[in-house]
A protein has these predicted regions:
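Charged C-terminal helix
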Residues: 258-299
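Short, charged, surface-exposed loops that flank catalytic or proteolytic processing sites
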Residues: 176-185, 252-262
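Single conserved hydrophobic/aromatic residue that forms the stacking wall/gate
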Residues: 1-15
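Conserved N-terminal subdomain of the carbohydrate kinase-like
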Residues: 20-129, 133-141, 293
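Short, small-residue alpha-helix embedded
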Residues: 170, 234-257, 261
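Conserved phosphate/ATP/ADP-binding segment of small-molecule kinases
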Residues: 142-224
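Short pre-catalytic strand/loop immediately N-terminal to key active-site residues, enriched for Gly-Thr
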Residues: 36, 224-238
Length: 299
């Protein structure tokens, strides 16, 4: 009898916990690696969405002491642990207001993430995919033909996608342009990608001219828009993660997709300017911590 009471009490506590969890502030699942030094992936995404009053729930794909641009780093592939890790969230009946995916290192990881989205996706949340595949016309070493095909399957579940030009052309099986891409070309490519599933697309980091970078925005069945930013310094690790997390946070807090991209571009530009002025090495990433208050003010 005493045992039965204890079991009943535990079930009651569990039920209360689940009820309270569902009442809490918005939650986003961040599926990405955890890197100790270098300001990238979950290490930048979690504090950014937290500053925007959103609870970050992490799903690690790998653990690194520093990102791969450093001459030495510790790496622990988390693929074989991901399903057991995710099972806890299923047993707790967690619900997410958004799901964000970043760099995925293998076909198996893409399969696991696709299954995660299928399980947790509903008509009240959205999925944002940053298809980290390559840049400047070259794919990363892990992205062979089979891996690219897996990523194309994942894109079908995205509501928002944030490719650069290399990733956009790869997802559409098009050659990387050997000229400055035109607005008409971008329109055609975005329409073609939207036909695969995404409602909102922003093609990031387009080298528009010698002094500006363009972010080309497409909302399905609506007009195209552009957000311009000054070209400052070189490429910095984690920039795409910062952009994706600011867009996700803004969009979760009720801002339009255009306003979300505009804020992300302005925030990144401000962080880059600080880094350049203070001679922060590019592989140390963005000093995003300096301007988190700018994001708090948007909530």
């Amino acid at each position: 009898e005493i045992s039965a009471c204890l079991v009943g009490s535990e079930m009651c506590i569990r039920d209360r916990f689940l009820t309270e969890v569902k009442k809490m502030q918005k939650k986003i699942a961040l599926i990405n690696d955890v890197t100790g030094f270098g300001r990238c992936s979950i290490a930048v995404m979690a504090p950014i969405v937290s500053a925007m009053k959103i609870q970050a729930v992490t799903v690690p794909t790998a653990i690194l002491s520093a990102h791969t641009q450093f001459p030495t780093f510790y790496f622990d592939d988390y693929t074989d642990k991901m399903e057991d890790y995710i099972q806890t969230y299923k047993e707790l009946n967690l619900e997410f207001d958004a799901i964000s995916t970043g760099f995925l290192g293998s076909e198996r990881q893409v399969e696991i993430v696709t299954d995660f989205i299928k399980y947790f996706k509903n008509d009240r949340n959205f999925v944002i995919v940053d298809p980290v595949m390559g840049d400047y016309g070259r794919l990363y070493q892990t992205y062979n033909k089979a891996m690219c095909n897996r990523m194309k399957e994942l894109v079908k579940y995205a509501d928002i996608i944030t490719p650069n030009l290399t990733e956009l052309t790869t997802l559409l099986d098009l050659p990387y342009p050997d000229h400055t891409v035109t607005i008409e070309e971008l329109k055609k490519m975005c329409i073609a990608l939207a036909a695969q599933g995404p409602k909102h697309i922003v093609v990031t980091g387009i080298r528009f001219n010698k002094t500006q970078i363009a972010n080309f925005i497409y909302n399905k069945d609506e007009d195209f828009q552009m957000v311009m930013a000054d070209r400052i310094g070189g490429d910095r690790s984690g920039t795409g993660d910062v952009i994706a997390s600011v867009i996700a946070g803004m969009y979760m807090n009720g801002h339009s997709f255009y306003e979300s991209v505009k804020k992300a571009a302005a925030y990144v530009s401000k962080c880059i300017s600080y880094c350049e002025e203070n001679k922060v090495p590019e592989y140390w990433g963005l000093c995003f911590e300096m301007y988190l208050k700018d994001l708090v003010d948007e909530c």
